[in-house]
């Protein structure tokens, strides 16, 4: 069974990658355009103010301790990634071109900002200096999340499609689009663009892995990342249900699962370093 699946999967990937480069780019762009069109046709998504009422995560007698402390998972992964890449601690250094590592640095910086933004959103009430979680403070949490998703998409574009396009063009444009999604929410109250910028990058990253040859990135890590992000989203959407199952709120668990998803990218880069050691001059796989 496993051998049959592997053979079918390999045949699918090969059949896609033998298409002309322009055709593969059009497949990717067409998919993105279709998803964007469907999002625009959907009704506006407004922020439910009840969203801020999270299931209990009390620990050590402190209300909502878990939902705040779980942001430490983001902080650990983000700082670890910044240290490993920013100080070139991945050895051998897997990046072959100047600037190739910048999307990953911004990705892990975004993860740190998520830890800070989410803590600010959740913890202020318990520190006694504001009225509690609100859409106004949630904006900073979500803005940081757009940095994470946009930088990651730019990294995969740069690795598998074109380095210059990924780093010099896609990265600033996508980061700007993420900021625009928050401005749109602030002005119109509509969250469609924000939700689109969470879901679409994951879909496009998986498609990029199928359509274009391997570089530093690997499909298995992207798939695991998507899995953990998907599980995190489930726990967030069914916060109270998860609490009913295990006596602990799903939103706090979401933080930990999403941090694991981010760690998959660091694991992928560490693996790329090991491959660089065993193969001094790697090239894209056929």
Predicted segments with their positions:
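Hydrophobic secondary-structure block in the mid-to-C-terminal portion of proteins
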Residues: 210-212
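Short, highly charged, low-complexity non-transmembrane loops/tails of multi-pass membrane proteins
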Residues: 276-286
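Extracellular-loop-to-transmembrane junctions of the mid-late helices
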Residues: 181-208
């Amino acid at each position: 069974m496993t051998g049959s699946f592997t053979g079918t999967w390999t045949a699918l990937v090969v059949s896609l990658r033998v298409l002309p480069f322009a055709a593969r780019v059009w497949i990717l762009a067409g998919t993105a355009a279709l998803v964007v069109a469907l999002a625009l046709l959907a009704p506006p998504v407004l922020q439910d103010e009840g969203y801020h009422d999270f299931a209990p995560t009390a620990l050590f007698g402190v209300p909502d301790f878990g939902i705040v402390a779980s942001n430490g998972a983001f902080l650990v992964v983000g700082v670890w990634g910044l240290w490993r890449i920013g100080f070139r601690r991945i050895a051998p250094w897997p990046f072959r071109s100047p600037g190739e590592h910048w999307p990953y640095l911004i990705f892990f910086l975004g993860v740190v900002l998520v830890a800070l933004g989410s803590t600010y959103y959740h913890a202020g009430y318990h520190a006694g200096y504001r009225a509690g979680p609100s859409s106004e403070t949630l904006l900073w949490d979500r803005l940081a999340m757009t940095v994470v998703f946009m930088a990651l998409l730019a990294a995969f574009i740069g690795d598998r499609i074109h380095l210059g396009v990924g780093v010099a063009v896609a990265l600033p444009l996508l980061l700007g689009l993420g900021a625009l999604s928050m401005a749109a929410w602030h002005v119109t109250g509509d969250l469609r663009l924000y939700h689109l910028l969470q879901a679409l990058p994951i879909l496009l990253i998986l498609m990029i892995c199928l359509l274009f040859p391997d570089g530093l990135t690997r499909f298995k890590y992207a798939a695991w990342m998507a899995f953990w992000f998907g599980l995190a989203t489930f726990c967030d959407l069914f916060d109270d249900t998860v609490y009913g199952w295990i006596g602990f709120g799903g939103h706090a668990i979401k933080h930990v699962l999403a941090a694991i998803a981010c760690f998959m990218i660091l694991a992928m880069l560490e693996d790329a370093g090991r491959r660089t050691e065993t193969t001094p001059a790697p090239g894209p796989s056929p």
